[in-house]
UniProtKB/Swiss-Prot annotation:
Gene name of the record: CAR3
GO BP, sorted A to Z: abscisic acid-activated signaling pathway; positive regulation of abscisic acid-activated signaling pathway; positive regulation of GTPase activity
Role noted for this protein: Stimulates the GTPase/ATPase activities of Obg-like ATPases. Mediates the transient calcium-dependent interaction of PYR/PYL/RCAR abscisic acid (ABA) receptors with the plasma membrane and thus regulates ABA sensitivity.
Cellular localisation: Cell membrane; Nucleus
UniProt protein name: Protein C2-DOMAIN ABA-RELATED 3
Organism of origin: Arabidopsis thaliana (Mouse-ear cress)
């Protein structure tokens, strides 16, 4: 059995920016983001001395199990010691996957397909909207980091169908 037999598609995660991240060095931090989906792990570049970093980086994961959560961890890069953890968040992909399974062609650009509100059960800092934009389903997410005194990270999800994949 090949990867293509189980492959549903590609999840592209745009790591946009961090907001008011924790200070882990003398007066600032050198943050980067690690994203994990199943056994896959990808990271952004380090932004030096900035608690409001702009990453604007696309990280792409192959998706074989739509039930796996996406985990985000922010670290402070250190040269001479272990990198300090600056908080984490977990993203439930199920609402996004459900939207992908709907028949949505012909909708006006910008249409809100679904709204997910912040709750104790998720890491959302504010309402997250799943929208139809340029014939694609896009979800903008602002995450409140856990296990840290402060900080938020903004990401955007986008799905890429692959020819020959199982699809959703």
């Amino acid at each position: 059995m090949s990867l293509m037999d189980n492959l549903l598609g590609i999840l592209r995660v745009r790591v946009q920016r961090g907001v008011n991240l924790a200070v882990r060095d003398v007066s600032s931090s050198d943050p980067y983001v690690v994203l994990k989906l199943g056994r896959q792990k990808l990271k952004t570049k380090v932004v030096k001395q900035n608690v409001n970093p702009q990453w604007q980086e696309d990280l792409s994961f192959t998706v074989t199990d739509p039930n796996l959560p996406l985990t985000l961890i922010v670290y402070d890069h250190d040269f001479f010691s272990k990198d300090d953890k600056m908080g984490d968040a977990e993203i439930d992909l199920k609402p996004y996957i459900e939207a992908l399974r709907m028949e949505l062609s012909g909708l006006p650009d910008g249409t809100i397909i679904s709204t997910i509100g912040p709750s104790r059960g998720n890491c959302l800092a504010e309402e997250s909207y799943i929208r139809w934009i340029n014939d694609r389903i896009v979800q903008h997410i602002c995450l409140r980091l856990r296990n840290v005194e402060r900080g938020e990270v903004e990401i955007e999800l986008q799905w890429i169908d692959l020819p020959g994949s199982k699809g959703l």
